[in-house]
A protein has these predicted regions:
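Transmembrane and membrane-interface helices of multi-pass
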Residues: 57-60, 85-232
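Intrinsically disordered, low-complexity segments enriched in serine/proline and basic residues
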Residues: 18, 30-33, 39, 45-48, ...
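Intrinsically disordered, low-complexity segments used as extracellular stalks/linkers
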Residues: 1-13, 40-41, 62-68, 75-83, ...
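Residue-identity detector for glycine
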Residues: 13-16, 24, 103
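Short coil-to-helix leader/linker segments, especially the first N-terminal amphipathic alpha-helix
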Residues: 228-258
Length: 609
């Protein structure tokens, strides 16, 4: 009976196991913990039921405690091990992420900063190239030498956009995230792995930036003419013989002999007007890219009248190395361009002090002839090496540092660059009056450089009740310079003085003159004494460059001069621009020259002024 009950229980237990086994074939996703617990519980129950010995129970309890302790140890050990691994992996992952993002940021910034800087330079300074930029960077700039508005505009239009786009690509959000998200969607279709997609999204940003970099640097290279700069400054240069063929070195002794025959030497007063074009006197509104509130014929009415009543040569063209202020001044005074600054010429102080020291320029000629010379400008003369250039060629400088004390007697005497032009002309008037009062006077050669019409333009509210705009700055300056010329022509000095008005270069104000317009630099010779009558056929339909003006300046005060440097007197012969053509002359001027490099050498026979 007892055996029958045991067998019955055994069958019942066996049936239960079979049932569980059968149902297990239809169940899925049991955890290892659940399976282990079931097995341990089943084995323990079975063992207790079948056990007939009391000594087995302690052994069973001991085994149970050992199993439980091992389970607890395993649970405690696994998190500690994973925590330890995560601690080791965290710095590595952080370092990798940091350098990955830093790479994206630096790559982006090196792409966008040169691009936006080039756009800013061309907006405010026109079609400049890398030669001009490096040239200015190699000279010290005084704290008051640059208008603070230019610094703010550079930060706003070049630096901040570069930083913003670089950060957007480094930490995608908003518009930048759309690009990354669209890439991730496409990549997910083919890669299926989130980790691969995430790594490829970083690669996508690098690829995207690389494509932009190719476009950006190609734009920068073309606009700034970087390849031409590298070619002209490489170690093993191919020198051209252009200067050897066309440069006519001024013969000071010969000029002295011609000067000695003049009974009464004439004076010379030159006014270099910032960005002044003959184009501004056009009656055709189609020449301009803007609309202004007054007829274009009235924009520079006084200057138009002075050019008509005096002697004015048609079509002074701007060629290579003459398109910014110091380059224009060098070209007018030395009859060669400022094409590049040789790296073997030295840096900063040496170049600034001995600027084109071995070249013979207009100042050297007048110094040899015994003229009194002076240069007047309202801005700081240290900018772009201007002070060093004129000191190297015997012309003393009167700039912001010497004029500002006088200017403080005027209300609102400053413009964007220093002392405004109306105050500068007032200073020059007093200087000329003091000179006229002298008993023993030398002949003089004085030079004045204006700044009100430098882009984006300064409107002198004391003279013109007009809103600030570039067109209004031209109109207001026209009134200021017209009053000064009228005063001078009524002064006792006018009779023996040739007054010359020259634009220093074409305007740098973008989108003011139509690109299709034939542009030329303003010039007017008032009361000249040319050695050959300037008939109409010698004045019209001509093609002159800055270089030809040097010979004309000497000839206008009765010193016969057929050529000077690369300049040719258009009253006597055809200019190089007319002989070679504009494109050929520009190409030749861009080539390295041994003669030009020698101009930068130190001349021990000269004295600095």
């Amino acid at each position: 009976m007892k055996q029958a009950q045991v067998m019955k229980q055994s069958k019942t237990g066996g049936g239960g196991n079979l049932k569980d086994s059968a149902s297990g074939n239809h169940c899925t996703d049991f955890t290892n913990f659940e399976r282990t617990a079931d097995l341990k519980s089943s084995s323990l129950s079975k063992f207790v039921k079948n056990s007939t010995s009391n000594t087995a129970i302690p052994r069973i309890l001991e085994q149970k405690q050992q199993l439980e302790s091992k389970s607890v140890d395993k649970k405690q050990t696994q998190p500690l091990e994973s925590h330890s691994d995560s601690e080791n992996q965290a710095p590595t992952l952080f370092t990798q992420a940091f350098f990955a993002r830093a790479g994206v940021f630096l790559f982006s910034f090196c792409t966008f900063f040169p691009f936006f800087s080039t756009l800013w330079v061309r907006r405010f300074f026109g079609k400049v190239d890398i030669t001009q930029i490096i040239f200015h960077l190699r000279f010290p700039v005084a704290p008051n030498g640059v208008d603070i508005d230019f610094i703010f505009s550079f930060v706003a239009l070049a630096l901040l956009p570069s930083l913003a786009i670089s950060l957007a690509l480094t930490y995608p959000s908003g518009t930048a995230r759309l690009f990354v998200a669209s890439y991730e969607i496409c990549a997910r279709l083919f890669l299926w792995s989130k980790e691969l997609v995430r790594s490829h999204s970083l690669i996508a940003r690098y690829v995207f930036i690389a494509l932009l970099s190719v476009y950006g640097w190609n734009y920068v290279g073309k606009k700034l003419k970087i390849s031409e700069f590298i070619a002209s400054n490489k170690v093993h240069k191919t020198y051209a013989n252009f200067y050897e063929s066309y440069y006519k070195a001024p013969d000071i002794e010969s000029i002295k002999q011609s000067f000695s025959t003049i009974q009464k030497p004439r004076n010379l007063l030159v006014i270099y007007m910032e960005s002044m074009e003959a184009t501004f006197g056009s009656n055709d509104a189609r020449d301009f890219a803007v609309k202004i509130s007054l007829p274009f014929a009235e924009l520079t009415q006084n200057l138009n009248s002075l050019a008509s009543s005096g002697i004015s040569f048609s079509h002074i063209r701007q060629t290579t190395g003459t398109g910014w202020t110091i380059a224009g001044l060098i070209s007018y005074n030395c009859a060669f361009p400022q094409t590049w600054l040789p790296f073997n010429a030295g840096f900063n102080d040496s170049v600034a002090r001995y600027f084109l020291h071995s070249a013979t320029c207009l100042g050297d000629v007048f110094s040899a002839l015994g003229y009194e010379q002076a240069f007047f400008r309202g801005a700081n003369a240290d900018f772009a090496g201007s002070r060093g250039f004129f000191a190297s060629h015997s012309i003393p400088m009167n700039d912001l540092s010497s004029i500002e004390a006088y200017a403080q007697g005027f209300e609102d005497y400053r413009n964007d660059w220093g002392v405004k032009d109306s105050v500068l002309f007032s200073y020059v008037k007093e200087y000329l009056q003091e000179y006229a009062a002298k008993k023993d006077k030398k002949p003089f050669a004085f030079y004045v450089l204006t700044a009100d019409t430098h882009a984006p333009g300064f409107v002198d509210k004391a003279y013109c009740d007009l809103p600030t705009s570039y067109a209004n700055s031209l109109h207001c300056f026209d009134k200021i310079v017209g009053e000064f010329v009228e005063w001078f022509l009524q002064s006792p000095l006018a009779k023996d003085t040739t007054l010359v008005l020259l634009g220093d270069h074409l305007t740098m104000q973008q989108r003011f003159v139509q690109d299709s317009t034939s542009r030329s630099i303003y010039n007017a010779f008032i009361n000249p004494a040319f050695t050959k009558p300037p008939t109409q056929d010698l004045l019209t339909e001509r093609a002159l460059s800055h270089f030809d003006i040097t010979a004309l300046l000497l000839d206008s005060i009765a010193i016969p001069t057929r050529d000077f440097g690369l300049g040719r007197n258009p009253l006597y012969e055809r200019t190089l621009l007319e002989q070679l053509g504009e494109s050929s002359l520009a190409a030749e001027l861009s080539k390295p020259s041994r003669v030009y490099e020698r101009f930068w050498e130190f001349d021990s026979t000269k004295e600095l002024h």
